[in-house]
């Protein structure tokens, strides 16, 4: 099976690296030339938390047209780049290619399905972490993490099943989950709260949790999100979601979520696929989402004024 990984940041490099380590035919496709060059020169340096790292040989390119048709394309680009990436990847895709998104947020599968056969689209939710240390270098922690996956239409697909088997053999702990969509929305609770609020405020997760006003916002965001999910037939529970926020936040109090890191680097965020998705789905279903809409627009203002700068003083 030939696999291309489109978007080889921290998580894409981990997924592709573990597959390559197990001798799967993998090609990284990413526009970051320094990363691609480092991988082609020395290999991908994979460093498990608390253990010795190792170099893994894997092919990498900035040009998707050089890859040829593959059996699987795994998308891990930022949501803001989904349409651009799928258009550039069409030369790798034919009527038999499985296209799997492991991206954050809601709405990427629909975007991808506009360009490829709907029955070939699959998605998954990742439950482990990875950090891009520098060009050609990642650190990661798998622990008991898994990837819950399913086809977009929920129907059995032998080629998709073959992919899951290969991912499992490579140590990625992938499995077919009937409630994978539930897990997408459960993860959205985390992203819509911690990622976005920490990004807007420039604080760590624990610092947000220590503020009662932070919980006022998180309860409001979560209540709307759960209502939208329930209307879509997804059985999220409000109290369970709040407890999940508390438990996760306590585990990683000193962490700046990925969206906050994007803001710090002044790059586009995935807000359209996080709170923006809640707002869009709410409008379709006739559900008001004022908390999500407010933080969505605040983040848009921040993105649109990156070049203005945030440092200011008030003269006396």
Regions found by a protein language model. Give the residues of each.
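NAD(P)+-binding Rossmann beta1-loop-alpha1 motif at the extreme N-terminus of oxidoreductases
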Residues: 1-52
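Rossmann-like NAD(P)(H) cofactor-binding subdomain of soluble oxidoreductases
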Residues: 29, 53-137
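Short alpha-helical
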Residues: 34, 80-81, 107, 155, ...
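Short, hinge-like loop/turn segments at secondary-structure boundaries
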Residues: 44-48, 117-119, 138-142, 192-194, ...
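Helix-loop-beta segment of a Rossmann-like dinucleotide-binding subdomain
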Residues: 93-96, 138-150, 201-208, 255-265
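Rossmann-fold dinucleotide-binding core
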Residues: 102-183, 187
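NAD(P)-dependent Rossmann-like dehydrogenase/reductase catalytic/cofactor-binding core
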Residues: 169, 219-316
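Active-site-proximal catalytic alpha-helix in oxidoreductases
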Residues: 181-209, 213-226, 253-254
């Amino acid at each position: 099976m030939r696999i291309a990984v489109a978007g080889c940041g921290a998580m894409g490099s981990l997924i592709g690296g573990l597959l390559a380590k197990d001798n799967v035919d993998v090609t990284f496709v990413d526009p970051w030339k320094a990363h691609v060059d480092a991988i082609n020169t020395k290999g991908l340096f994979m460093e498990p938390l608390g253990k010795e790292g190792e170099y893994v040989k894997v092919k990498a390119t900035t040009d998707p047209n050089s890859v040829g048709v593959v059996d699987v394309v795994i998308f891990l680009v930022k949501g803001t780049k989904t349409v651009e990436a799928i258009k550039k990847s069409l030369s790798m895709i034919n009527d038999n290619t499985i296209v799997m998104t492991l991206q954050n947020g809601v709405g990427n599968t629909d975007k991808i399905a506009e360009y490829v056969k709907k029955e070939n689209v699959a998605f998954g939710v990742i439950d482990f972490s990875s950090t891009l240390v520098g060009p050609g270098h990642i650190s990661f922690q798998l622990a008991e993490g898994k990837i819950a996956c399913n086809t977009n239409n929920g129907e059995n697909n032998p080629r998709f099943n073959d992919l899951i088997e290969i991912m499992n053999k490579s140590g990625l702990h992938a499995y077919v989950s009937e409630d994978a969509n539930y897990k997408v929305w459960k993860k959205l609770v985390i992203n819509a709260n911690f990622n976005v609020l920490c990004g807007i405020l420039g604080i760590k997760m624990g610092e947000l949790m220590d503020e009662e006003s932070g919980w006022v916002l998180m309860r409001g965001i979560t209540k709307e999100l759960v209502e939208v999910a329930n209307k879509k037939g997804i059985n999220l529970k409000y109290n369970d979601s709040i407890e999940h926020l508390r438990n996760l936040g306590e585990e990683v109090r000193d962490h700046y979520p990925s969206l906050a890191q994007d803001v710090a680097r002044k790059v586009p965020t995935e807000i359209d696929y996080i709170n923006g998705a809640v707002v869009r789905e709410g409008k379709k279903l006739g559900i008001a989402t004022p908390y999500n809409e407010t933080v969505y627009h605040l983040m848009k203002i921040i993105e649109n004024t990156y070049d203005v700068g945030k440092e200011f003083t008030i003269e006396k």
